[in-house]
């Protein structure tokens, strides 16, 4: 079962396998390494992204390949400390008065110290976005576990681009690639 193979392995093992495969194919002139949607299985908090095991390991990889930029898929979490900043997809933290949102994200790790995060804008109905949330949210606990997050993910209405020294990249995550309007502009499309 592909869901068991991907989502039942611990995040360190999956990352180590990804890095091992990458090292066998990288050289000093490689400028971009791509990882697929949800390649990073670690729960990555955006406010502490540089403390993430996965980001540290990918930074170590970059130290061996100084021109390398990395675009990789991940599930990221954003802490919301103000009740006024909550969204319709925000979830309450257990035992705390804070909320958070979960995103299907593309993380761009520059060859410098910068890290940019793109949040998927077009969510898959029924999988990443529950229709009629007030009516259907109580049913989330009955959803089939396919290795992901139950309930609606957060989204942004921003169509970010990432830049390397000689290229502009517009990441599209999975289902977004069917939306032609997301691909406009003077950028190279990369679907993860």
How does the language model describe each region?
Residues 1-126, 161-166, 171-183:
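Soluble catalytic regions of membrane-associated enzymes that act on cell-envelope
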Residues 137-141:
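Short, basic/low-complexity N-terminal boundary segments at the transition from targeting/disordered tails
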Residues 124-136:
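A short, polar/charged loop-to-alpha-helix boundary motif
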Residues 34, 190-192:
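Hydrophobic beta-strand scaffold positions of dinucleotide-using enzymes
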Residues 142-168, 173:
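Cysteine/selenocysteine-centered motifs that mediate thiol-based redox chemistry or coordinate metal-sulfur cofactors
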């Amino acid at each position: 079962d592909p869901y068991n193979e991907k989502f039942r392995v611990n995040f360190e093992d999956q990352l180590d396998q990804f890095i091992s495969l990458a090292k066998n194919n990288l050289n000093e002139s490689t400028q971009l390494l791509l990882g697929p949607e949800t390649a990073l299985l670690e729960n990555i908090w955006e406010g502490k992204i540089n403390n993430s095991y996965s980001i540290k390991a990918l930074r170590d990889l970059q130290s061996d390949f100084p021109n390398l930029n990395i675009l990789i898929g991940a599930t990221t979490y954003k802490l919301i400390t103000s009740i006024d900043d909550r969204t319709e997809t925000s979830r309450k933290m257990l035992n705390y008065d804070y909320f958070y949102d979960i995103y299907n994200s593309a993380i761009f790790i520059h060859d410098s110290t910068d890290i940019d995060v793109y949040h998927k804008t077009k969510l898959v109905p029924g999988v990443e976005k529950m229709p009629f949330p007030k009516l259907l949210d109580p049913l989330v606990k009955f959803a089939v576990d396919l290795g992901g997050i139950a309930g609606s993910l957060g989204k942004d209405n921003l169509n970010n681009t990432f830049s390397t020294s000689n290229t502009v990249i517009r990441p599209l995550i999975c289902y977004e690639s069917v939306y032609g309007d997301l691909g406009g502009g003077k950028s190279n499309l990369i679907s993860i």
